[in-house]
Amino acid sequence: MVIKVVLLIVFFAIMIGVGVYTRKAATDVNGFVLGGRSVGPWLTAFAYGTSYFSAVVFVGYAGQFGYKYGLSDTWIGIGNAVIGSLLAWLVLGRRTRVMSKHLNSATMPDFFGKRYHSNAIRIAAALIAFIFLIPYTSSVYNGLSRLFGMAFDIPYSVCVIAMAVLTGVYVILGGYMATAVNDFIQGIIMLIGIVAVIVGVLNGNGGFIEAYKTLSQMESDVAVTEGLQGAFVSFFGPDPVNLLGVVILTSLGTWGLPQMVQKFYAIKDERSIKTGTIISTFFAFVIAGGCYFLGGFARLVDVTEITVNGSLAYDAVIPSMLSKLPDILIGVVVVLVLSASMSTLSSLVLTSSSILTLDLIKGSISKNMNEKKQLFVMRVLIVFFIVLSVVLALDPPTFIAQLMGISWGALAGAFLAPLAYGLYWKGVTRAGVWAGFVAGVGITVANIFAKWTSPINAGAISMIAGLVVVPLVSFITPKLEKGEIDFSFKCYDKKPVIEKKIALPEDLVAEEK
């Protein structure tokens, strides 16, 4: 117990210390929201990765999908690395950075408003982000509480409040730069922690070969492959179709999430994007691949906890796997998941507060608000969002994965297509953007009431629908003015200026002497 407490105290002290150290970088709106657009590739890549993977992934998704799909759930981690990180950086990174700087936009709704020359689109995007980021923030705590309850036997409410207060302190002090530096530290902890945990769990089950053999002898209880042995160690698992839905939601979804795309706004230059792409992809392979690989052995643990609906409590799977580890490893796990959760929470509340302040309050209500007042309002809203997320977390309405599925589906379904097409194609119309918003949010919300499929599949469908609807509607609706389009895209015509030192000929140098 002493080891675990010491690790936590040191961790908390470092987080607060970083907030104090970086407070000088948060003296204006640009510094507070984007770190002055001067954040290096390492900090940006780690900020992207740690915002991507939280306790939702480690406890919620890894436990649930590892139990359902066995080792084939590792495909989710591979998809996260290839589609959610590598392709996201290659396709969106440079163009998002260049166009957002050209349009002087600090948030995704502001980008939409300026790219499509529509204040109504900006306000609608801000409202969608405001409404659907909340379920994600509340879900971050839930996974953490399971591990804290296992390690320290302390009440859930204490876990939630302590984490919220600590996150709020360093975000309010240092803004984006505090989150970026802390994300880097937390990312290092996550990399070390996930490797140590996998080794510890496999050793506790007789090593990889023995664990694999035991898993291969289990009969599938999934309808598609019911009764078959070896389904949980097969290439695509017992239920490939639903597995594909999870891969699409968790991988392609990052392309449309405001808190993820914002990382491209803040990176300092185009050269840094190349370095960041490599780092971010490696980070995702280790963290996501490791989490889902670990979850693939979930059936080796006897989980008896049942929900009120009579189904297995998937949120208890990973904590049960870890409960027999030595104290030092449990301490590492707690700090690992705390790191993942705090980094995601800090990114979410900073994104939410900046969108509400810059796009709704300053953009529509108090247009003459000065920078000092904007900073004050953002800090107040950070407190508001954290308190709201705590209230929701203390009475969670559904499973971690379902909460995440609702928010990811609505946000990515609404924003992915208007963003991706808007960066490359001059033909996107305002009507096409509105159609994307309606399709993304409409499918997700309709499924909440109709329950015709799982929130995971509904989220994946909403993203694909947006990618289809936006171009179709754009083909048959009035185009933007040529001047409006040319203004947005002329940023790509600019060539980076490279300073070249020219050496004087030797005879001129001699003559000068």
Question: Where on the chain are the PLM-derived regions?
Answer:
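Membrane-embedded helix-loop-helix hairpins and adjacent transmembrane boundary segments
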Residues: 1-513
